[in-house]
């Protein structure tokens, strides 16, 4: 169930002593201990939440959902990522310890989905913010597809060399855009613009001569109506 082929972990002597490397040992220890950070922003997360149930039981893969990025090594971005959420997503990724992995789940996360054509506030692909290891297309992907993506990620982890991954991440390091706020003149002075207010004339303020003059000029038929 959790068997992954190791190209370098096959040197077994006659005395049943396994000869391997530190990279292979580290990769093997992380295969069944991927702790995902739940980052759901849309309907794709509902499909991922069904994996927690007894039907799919993703605990057999060693997946333990975490609510803190400092305790997670995998983040599943499920749903639409907006411009306002982009700095928060990058900050969560930076707070995760190395080595860390990203699975982009759903069409909205990969390309923007239905919001990619005429939306002014949607990120066209989460890979513009953080590096993605596995792309999982669908709208939304089925739970079986999520399990397949996790299996592919575990195969990638088993063949990984830590030094190479660290070097590649340094070359494609993401960055956080700082928001700049400019303090302008306050428009809340406490005084209302009287020119914008509509003041309807009251009957008490209307002179009696004008009122009776207007009443005498109106026909009885108009008064009835």
UniProtKB/Swiss-Prot annotation:
Keyword match Metal-binding: yes
Keyword terms, alphabetized: 4Fe-4S, Chloroplast, Iron, Iron-sulfur, Membrane, Metal-binding, NAD, NADP, Plastid, Plastoquinone, Quinone, Thylakoid, Translocase, Transport
InterPro entries, A to Z: NADH_UbQ_OxRdtase-like_20kDa (IPR006137), NADH_UQ_OxRdtase_20Kd_su (IPR006138)
One example of a Gene Ontology biological process annotation: electron transport coupled proton transport
Bilayer topology term: Peripheral membrane protein
Residues given in the record as [4Fe-4S] cluster binding sites: 43-44, 108, 139
Localization (cell): Plastid, Chloroplast thylakoid membrane
Cofactor entry: [4Fe-4S] cluster
Cofactor binding note from Swiss-Prot or TrEMBL: Binds 1 [4Fe-4S] cluster.
One Pfam family cited in the UniProt record for this chain: Oxidored_q6
EC code: 7.1.1.-
Reactions it catalyzes: a plastoquinone + NADH + (n+1) H(+)(in) = a plastoquinol + NAD(+) + n H(+)(out); a plastoquinone + NADPH + (n+1) H(+)(in) = a plastoquinol + NADP(+) + n H(+)(out)
Enzyme class: translocase
Molecular function via GO: 4 iron, 4 sulfur cluster binding; iron ion binding; NADH dehydrogenase (ubiquinone) activity; quinone binding
Complex formation: NDH is composed of at least 16 different subunits, 5 of which are encoded in the nucleus.
UniProt record similarity statement: Belongs to the complex I 20 kDa subunit family.
Entries under HAMAP family matching the protein: NDH1_NuoB (MF_01356)
PANTHER family: NADH DEHYDROGENASE (PTHR11995), NADH DEHYDROGENASE [UBIQUINONE] IRON-SULFUR PROTEIN 7, MITOCHONDRIAL (PTHR11995:SF14)
Cited function: NDH shuttles electrons from NAD(P)H:plastoquinone, via FMN and iron-sulfur (Fe-S) centers, to quinones in the photosynthetic chain and possibly in a chloroplast respiratory chain. The immediate electron acceptor for the enzyme in this species is believed to be plastoquinone. Couples the redox reaction to proton translocation, and thus conserves the redox energy in a proton gradient.
Protein name: NAD(P)H-quinone oxidoreductase subunit K, chloroplastic
Organism field: Nandina domestica (Heavenly bamboo)
Gene name of the record: ndhK
